[in-house]
Amino acid sequence: CIAVVFALAGCVLESSAPLFSEEQGELALKPLGTRFVGEAMENGQWKSDGAIGIFTASGRHYVLSSEKDDKTTDLLFVPMGNARYVLQMQDDSRKGEPYVYLIADVADGHAMLSILDCDQLKKLGGLEESIAFDGSDCSVKGNPGLALFSSLAGQIAPAKMRLTPVK
């Protein structure tokens, strides 16, 4: 469903430890349902691979699974206001994978996902106090909280991925 994000791992903003706790999470997708298809913008059109992701609430976060395999991804939506969230994700946490960060806007029946691409962040400039850049990789320094993500949300490219509910 959103496995494309992890195909980009090493190219998106990440951290080795979580920046946000379970208590900060919100079940942002609850009004939309539990089954979603991931779509990516290609040549001005939304296109899907048809894979359905199942978002199961667990406390104040989601566990994303699919009918195709037993891999899971933990997703924590941390509210920033106005239906905008920092999305903290960890693919198959049993293996100690890094946490990856996106910006999610939940509106109009979709969750629009904006990738925090390292090359794009480097071009913005002035982020060296908060983000360590190493080639095409980047990681958060310390724990800047929501302030960093609120700032980035206003500067990054529009969403190129979205989650669409499946009935």
Residue ranges of each PLM-predicted region?
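Sec-dependent signal peptide recognition
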Residues: 1-5
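C-terminal motif of bacterial Sec signal peptides marking the signal peptidase cleavage site
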Residues: 7-10
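Calycin-type beta-barrel ligand-binding domains and close structural analogs
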Residues: 12-32, 39-50, 56-167
